[in-house]
Swiss-Prot record:
Name of the molecule in the record: Leucokinin-like peptide
One example of a Gene Ontology biological process annotation: neuropeptide signaling pathway
Species this protein is from: Delia radicum (Cabbage root fly)
Record keywords: Amidation, Neuropeptide, Secreted
Keyword Secreted among record annotations: yes
Keyword Isomerase: no
Main location: secreted
Localization annotation: Secreted
Function of the molecule: Acts through intracellular calcium in Malpighian tubule stellate cells to raise chloride conductance.
Tissue expression: Expressed in the CNS but not in midgut, ring gland, thoracic perisympathetic organs (tPSO) or abdominal perisympathetic organs (aPSO) (at protein level).
Length: 15
């Protein structure tokens, strides 16, 4: 779960 959250957070930062 932590991995998904980190990936999502990183993607959000890009946008």
């Amino acid at each position: 779960n932590s991995v998904v959250l980190g990936k999502k957070q990183r993607f959000h930062s890009w946008g």
